[in-house]
Swiss-Prot record:
Family the UniProt entry places it in: Belongs to the TRAFAC class translation factor GTPase superfamily. Classic translation factor GTPase family. EF-G/EF-2 subfamily.
Protein name: Elongation factor 2
Binding site for GTP: 28-35, 94-98, 148-151
GO cellular component terms attached to this protein's record: cytosol; ribonucleoprotein complex
Major subcellular site: cytoplasm
Species of origin: Methanococcus maripaludis (strain DSM 14266 / JCM 13030 / NBRC 101832 / S2 / LL)
Compartments it resides in: Cytoplasm
Length: 727
């Protein structure tokens, strides 16, 4: 039996022992060394050859990733590691660090209980470090820290042992400051990265060595020894004395929780059902014999097997051939194959139990974030939806070059939307174009070139990228009458800005899109009040949609309950297109204050009520001082001081705002905010301005009001592009 086959047998055995399972992820800012670290962990565990680790990038098994040298999708792998005489099963997920692929990070966080946050010793804490940490802590995923590229501090920056320790302490202090700010209240102190007890490791993933304070005490290696090894270019010997996989995996097993421990505090955070129900108790206890409950965290498309769903099980067990139920899409499915992940391969197993991550085939209609349960015991409600820190900010129109490819193109686009819920796919009914919205230029490029072109074999024409704008209101409208086409039904409403704290809660994922069937649920009401909505209104919310809400403030109108679903549909249609440029509306609260209906139900059907509400909402928004909002990005530039002026000039030329500047040695760090509309071609321009000597990164930072003097011009450009008549 080969080494790999033995590993599979061990994995099958360990899957049943919760205390010896760790579901963990590796996350970081782009190019801080996540995938190199993952590969060396795999090599140490005997999954790939040691000679190739570091260059092989086993988890970058997509051609596009290997070509770009960055991780685009989150890859999964199971492996075994021995610690203190016991074997442990490690389910490892390597996540992308590039801001355009943040959706994969969000989805991976739902599957794992602990994370190794990788931070480059040279660059320190960067924007994406903060973002991935925020996402981890929001999902109650416990972090430990690995400071990578330490050899560069010694060989390139020539730091002394004292300076080395100073640099480490600065990075650790910054990470701990973020943990204290963002961790759940009960873990703010407990989850801090403490060097002394081994929650921090230092090393070089590329050169395959790592060290932690407990390991230094055990092995007798000091910082001075490390400097000597690096200066003498003898890092191979250092890797034998302090192997990376041993130090990092020991740290992970000791400090990251097993599923039994983690699910006790994670389940109440991601599932808002009855904690005292059988399934509620079973999930908290991670019971393999309880009712089935799991969540799909990723969809991978395999040329031979079709759609494969990566799934984290919180309760129960899945066997091959089991009937399943998908809560979100309300569909039944069957588990055709049950497997574990081994990088690009999947190994079939007879069954998978609670606390593990598995691969399922047969879930055709599943999307990322879907709740999986048994048809005989349906999980109500499903798991909380996955909320992302970024939103799609760029749209392109695509058309198949050959019309016979159209049906296939539509199928691929459907598949992409299922795989990646940060992508929006729409069909422009008038032009027949398909519109794809994504997180940035690279995200869109990977979808059009790789997913459609390379994998789908379809040649497409891709239009110029278009920025996604939003509309909101600055004032309150008068009372507006919405009248049905037959003039027999009238609804009266007022549009006003949503409370800032309520909208902020929506953006943070504490509130989400929801229709309330009769009245606000008790849980929904409590969340709304906590977010800052008046109790009187919180009871009467009819629907929250795309960051807008409608509240029923009428009294004693009998027919209103019958028309409730139609009113909600009319409200949704009303906020899909704003009055200025037919862009989506956000941050608007519609108060329904009165209504009169025809007594005969036949005269108050969908064709009457939906248009009445839709026109009423649009009119109310149009009379409440509407304004355009544009997406913004935080831009961080790290450049030698000689080029600081050029870097600042580049930001200022793009309507940017310098927010902060820091000096570190002979480097300057510029923090700024720039509209996405001005960021096209930035990569080439900033490299030119600093002669290629800068590091830079961007991150979505929300929507801001377009300056007054540009509002009419941008609104006209959007209207012209959409073929709408000019206002």
């Amino acid at each position: 039996m080969g080494r790999r086959a033995k590993m599979v047998e061990k994995v099958k055995t360990l899957m049943e022992t919760h205390e010896q399972i760790r579901n963990m992820g590796i996350c970081a800012h782009i190019d801080h060394g996540k995938t190199t670290l993952s590969d060396n962990l795999l090599a140490g565990a005997g999954m790939i050859s040691k000679e190739l680790a570091g260059d092989q990038l086993a988890l970058d098994f997509d051609e596009e990733e290997a070509a770009r040298g960055i991780t685009i999708y989150a890859a999964n792998v199971s492996m075994v590691h021995e610690y203190s005489g016991k074997e442990y099963l490690i389910n490892l997920i390597d996540t992308p660090g590039h801001v355009d692929f943040g959706g994969d990070v969000t989805r991976a966080m739902r599957a794992i209980d602990g994370a190794v946050v990788v931070c480059c010793a040279v660059e320190g804490v960067m924007p994406q470090t903060e973002t991935v940490l925020r996402q981890a802590l929001k999902e109650k995923v416990k972090p430990v820290l690995f400071i990578n590229k330490v050899d560069r501090l010694i060989n390139e920056l020539k730091l002394t042992p004292e300076e080395l320790q100073g640099r480490f302490m600065k990075i650790i202090a910054e990470v701990n400051k973020l943990i204290e700010k963002m961790a759940p209240e009960e873990f703010k102190k407990e989850w801090l990265c403490d060097v002394a007890n081994g929650k921090v490791a230092f090393g070089s993933a590329y050169n395959n060595w790592a060290i932690s304070v407990p390991y230094m005490q055990r092995s007798g290696i000091s910082f001075k020894d490390i400097i000597d090894y690096c200066e003498q270019e003898n890092q191979k010997e250092l890797a034998e004395k302090a192997p990376l996989h041993e130090v990092v995996l020991d740290m992970s097993i000791k400090h990251l929780p097993n599923p039994l421990t983690a699910q006790k505090y994670r389940i109440p955070n991601i599932w808002k059902g009855d904690a005292e129900s059988t399934i509620g108790k079973s999930m908290v206890a991670c019971d393999p014999n309880g009712p089935l409950a799991g969540v799909v965290t990723k969809i991978i498309v395999d040329k031979h097997a079709g759609a494969i769903s990566a799934c984290r099980l919180f309760s129960g067990r899945i066997k091959q051939g089991d009937d399943l139920y998908l809560v979100g899409s309300k569909q039944k499915a069957r588990a055709q194959q049950v497997s574990i992940f081994m990088g690009a391969e999947r190994v079939q197993v007879p069954s998978i139990s609670a606390g593990n991550i598995c691969a399922l085939t047969g879930l055709r209609e599943a999307t990322a974030g879907e709740t999986v349960c048994s048809p005989s015991e349906i999980l109500e409600p499903g798991f909380e939806s996955l909320s992302h820190t970024s939103e799609p900010v760029i749209t392109v129109a695509i058309e198949a070059k050959n019309t016979k490819d159209l049906p296939k193109l539509i199928e691929i686009l459907r598949q992409i939307a299922r795989e990646d819920n940060t992508v929006r796919v729409e069909i422009n009914e008038e032009t027949g174009e398909h519109l794809i919205s994504g997180m940035g230029e690279l995200h869109i490029e990977v979808i059009t070139n790789t997913k459609i072109g390379r994998d789908g074999g379809i040649e497409v024409d891709v239009g110029e990228p278009i920025v996604v704008y939003r509309e909101t209101i600055m004032g309150t409208s008068p009372e507006i009458e919405g009248k049905s086409p037959n003039k027999h039904n009238k609804l009266y409403m007022i549009a006003e800005p949503m409370e800032e704290s309520v909208y902020a809660a929506y953006v943070e994922g504490k509130l989400h899109d929801e229709d309330y069937k009769k009245k606000t649920t008790a849980d929904g009401e409590a969340r709304l009040v906590e977010a800052g909505l008046e109790k009187d209104q919180a009871k009467k919310v009819m629907s929250i949609y795309n960051g807008n809400m409608i509240v029923n403030m009428t009294r004693g109108i009998v027919q209103l309950d019958e028309a409730r679903e139609l009113i909600i549909e009319g409200f949704k249609e009303g906020v899909r297109n704003g009055p200025l440029a037919a862009e989506k509306v956000q941050g608007v609260k519609i108060r329904l204050v009165d209504a009169t209906f025809h007594e005969d139900a036949i005269h108050r059907g969908p064709a009457q009520i939906i248009p009445a509400v839709r026109f009423g909402v649009r009119d109310a928004v149009a009379q409440a001082k509407p304004v355009l909002l544009e997406p913004m990005q935080s831009v961080y530039i790290n450049t030698p001081q000689d080029y600081m002026g050029d870097g600042m000039k580049e930001i200022n030329n793009r309507r940017g705002q310098i927010l902060d500047m820091e000096q570190e040695g002979d480097m300057s760090i510029i923090k700024s905010s720039v509209p996405v509309a001005e960021m096209f071609g930035f990569a080439g321009a900033i490299r030119g301005a600093t002669q290629g000597r800068c590091l830079w990164s961007v991150e979505f930072s929300g929507f801001e009001r377009v300056p007054n003097e540009l509002q009419p011009k941008i609104a006209k450009q959007i209207r012209d592009r959409k073929g709408l008549k000019s206002e």
